[in-house]
Amino acid sequence: GSRGFKPRAADERVGYFVTNYTDLGKFDWADTSQRLINRWHIEKADPKLSMSPPKEPIVYYIDHTVPIRYRRYVKQGIEYWNEAFREIGIDGAIQVQYQDKTTGANMDKDPEDVRYNFIRWISNDIATAIGPSRVNPMTGEILDADVVLTDGWIRVFTYRWEDLLSNLATEGMSPETMGWLDANPKWDPRLRLAPPSRREQILVERAQQRAHDSHSGHGVNHDSSMMIGENRFDGLGGRASQVNGMCEAATGKALDLAMMRMSLSMVRLLETAAEMGDDPEMSEEMLEMIRKQLAENPALRDMIPAEQLAMLEKAVDEDEADDAEDDGEEVAVKKKDEGDMIDGVPEWFVGPMLAELVAHEVGHTIGLRHNFKGSSAHSLEEINSEEMKGVKPWSTSVMDYNGINIRMPGSGETQGDYSVIGIGEYDQWAIEYGYGSGDLKEILSRSADPLLAYGTDEDAFGPDPRTRRYDLSENPLDYAKNQMELVKKIRAGLINDFVQDGDSWSRARRGYSITLSTQMQSLSMMGNWVGSAYVSRSKKGDPDSKAPIEVVPVERQRAALQFVIDNAFEDEAYGITPELLAHATVDKWWDNYSSISSDSAFQIHDRVMGMQASALTMLLNPQTVSRVYDYEMFVPADEDALTVAELLNTVNESVWSELKDGGKGTYTLRKPMISSLRRNLQREHLDRLIDMSMDNGGFNSASMAVKTIASMDLRDLKKTIDGSLKSGSLDGYTKAHLQEASVRIEKALDADYIYNAEDMAGGGGMTIIFGQEGKDRP
């Protein structure tokens, strides 16, 4: 290590990787574990100066493999951190040099040499970025660090969207939940969202994994990875010095970039409308662009405020009238200058996104851990305002997996920055603690400031919904609604706008799959808010600090619950049309085995059922239900709170809403009372309700409450179903569905005692019904 380096103690209020050891010279258990933050030896060349260059800067070399078109954004992302070091009086703490094959500059430096810190670039089809480091295990001093970037997140259309769906569906689930899903695979989104041909293989792999892990399927248990990068918790446990073993920031960027590619024309039109103000004067080039986009995608009209739409259409109509009066002389129309395109994406979009990604990974190399609360500081109205746009980052930390900001009408007055444009308040504070020379206790005492909130990887499966990957805004419900509006508009233009002449129709299926991923991301994001509580890391005595656990206001939980219901359970949420299904196909190539095994026709029922089943799991899994049950006691009895009964009843009423009118009306097999998608949902929900009515111990302390409420709901549901069956106007599909549901409920309620109920996952135990033996559980 460096001469004169002084180790610095770690503190849970600020996120650094740590080097830890056990001091057996201490006899107080709280003192035996010693933790030091991982940091570079950076100090002023002249301590007497308020602003001084460093004695020895951190130098990063941009590898010659980084494409020239991206190099300036890579450099920009690295240098973002100099702002934080200037705040503590060190100017130029980080320096950047290019390695260039043409000029020979720095080509004598080997990226594998530990004396040099490199930003490396790899071309592949995987969205990856990582910032590992080498640390002195005695002191926590960082000795060497590198960043590895791939361009896979830019090459987004080769992504396996099925895999991403299951990852998004289980985002935020705890080790206990993942272990429970392992024992109850029919509830498991990872299985339900997988292609049917792969499900048996997944179960076999899961069984092998259970032999090694206490909470199978959750990465926090994988301490023994042979190589870092196998799961998201690599580098954190089972080692003296933590490192960034895996980072998924680029994975979110892949989905964001895919959505941007699909919505590019829409975004341009919305920006044009927003920038018009009271001045309808536009160039010929602009008018031609607007005319073309409105003709190709009429759904765009619904997205523009009425006053601005009227101005746009008036300007286009007047221009067309002028053309009609022309003597026949053709007017050459020059395409609007939209700036340079890089790999099919506007430079003004992908450039800042890359700079943010680089800043995130460089943050890891200077010791910082993830902070998933960074994006929760500001509302969408603030983010999409002139006061913030281009002036300050809308996230307090580049160490978050920040979502992308594509503004839809009603989400602010103007389109704000799409990406985070620099380090935030938390980042500056973290550098002040790790590298500054001020009073460390005073620095840490500011932790209760909302702009300095911190939550990291192990918090992301806890009860705090703000510690969330890929979300955005102080109220993520607004962001989720914004994303679903974007999804609807993109789906409306899939056939006529996204798939161009000469394109394969497989683009329609890929495009639709991308929108499903964004939909799942929004559902999972809001599912985390049901049964949630804010968690604070502040300590007693910190100014303005709150209780460490604060139940999320019931209004927010109910709004989140309703969002999941509206956007997962209703047919309209999926934007399915006969035209879409007729065109959503696949290409058949032997170099892409997944396409060879895929059906040319989209298996829409299976895909939607996977989405709906996953949403039910988000709301009704034991961890969520138990938290709702526990949090009832956190709230005084004279105050409103979400209850287990309300949660189950709300889901029940929404899933079976068709029964409210008792089957009145006229129905046919082609226009049934209950659609095919909703029949699948209702059968799935009935399975869950029966499971919950037969206590298998999975719901812990809430088991008896869940059992009794679920049994009551089953009795009420049977009465409603039987009443609807008396209607003589039911179609054949609905009648058969309801008859089967009624019989299943009756058999379930007849069960007086379940033998071996706690082992239902083993294929279903024998059910001993009073007066009946040997009947299989329904």
How would you describe each model-predicted region?
Residues G1-V66, A84, I88, Q99-E325, ...:
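Auxiliary tRNA-acceptor-end handling modules of aminoacyl-tRNA synthetases
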Residues T65-A93:
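Zn2+-dependent metallopeptidase catalytic core
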Residues R72, G131, V156-W161, M408-Q415:
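Short conserved micro-motifs at the rims of enzyme active sites and ligand-binding pockets
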Residues Q76-N82, G140, E356-N371:
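Active-site recognition of the HExxH zinc-binding catalytic motif
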Residues E87-T102, H370-E381:
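Short, glycine/acidic-rich hinge or "gate" loops at secondary-structure transitions
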Residues D223, Q242-F349, G374-P778:
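Conserved catalytic/binding loops enriched for acidic/polar residues
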